[in-house]
């Protein structure tokens, strides 16, 4: 929705709602964390019956302020919104805040697994992954790490890894 004209987004969203209204919601639930993966990966998850019930993606939920402020001026609003954003490694958030934020999503959504998507050479996004994976595993969750390249299409190897992960959480 970020780059679409509102008319295009609204019609696409209405189509999505109409198509998915009567869908069976029994597939395994996952959270995506990191960088939004290529659409082919998302389509593969959809074909496998996976439900992405929440996200901790840099360009999705991590950009949404967690609380609405009371500031009036444009600069105050900008500052308030920046500091109201969810924890993010690109802003130097403490790792425990990120873990708590993710685990809160896990508990609210009855999640079976977490998929961590990172782009090669995007170090800030990878800084917290070892501790976040450990926290997810301690909670009994399965994890999948996808080390991707910008605009990397779905390869056979990547598809096999995703399919194996889906089998583990199903």
Where in the sequence are the language-model features?
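A charged, amphipathic alpha-helical module
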Residues: 1-67
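Gly/Ser/Thr-rich loops at beta-strand to alpha-helix junctions
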Residues: 31-39, 120-127, 153
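A short, acidic, amphipathic alpha-helical segment used as a generic capping/interface helix at domain edges
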Residues: 93-110, 127-128
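Acidic beta-strand-to-loop metal/phosphate-binding motif
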Residues: 112-120
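Peripheral docking tails and interdomain loops at the edges
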Residues: 130-170
């Amino acid at each position: 929705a970020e780059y679409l004209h509102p008319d295009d987004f609204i019609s696409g969203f209405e189509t999505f709602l109409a198509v998915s209204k009567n869908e069976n919601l029994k597939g395994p639930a996952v959270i995506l964390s990191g960088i939004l993966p290529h659409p082919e990966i998302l389509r593969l998850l959809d074909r496998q019956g996976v439900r992405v019930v929440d996200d901790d993606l840099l360009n999705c939920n991590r950009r949404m302020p967690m609380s609405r402020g009371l500031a009036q001026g444009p600069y105050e609003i900008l500052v308030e919104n920046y500091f109201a954003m969810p924890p993010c490694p690109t802003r130097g958030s403490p790792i425990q805040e990120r873990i708590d934020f993710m685990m809160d999503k896990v508990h609210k959504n009855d999640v079976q697994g977490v998929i961590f998507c990172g782009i090669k050479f995007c170090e800030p996004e990878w800084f917290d992954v070892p501790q976040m994976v450990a926290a997810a595993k301690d909670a009994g969750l399965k994890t999948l790490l996808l080390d991707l390249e910008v605009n990397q299409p779905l390869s056979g190897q990547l598809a096999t890894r995703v399919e194996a992960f889906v089998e583990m959480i199903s």
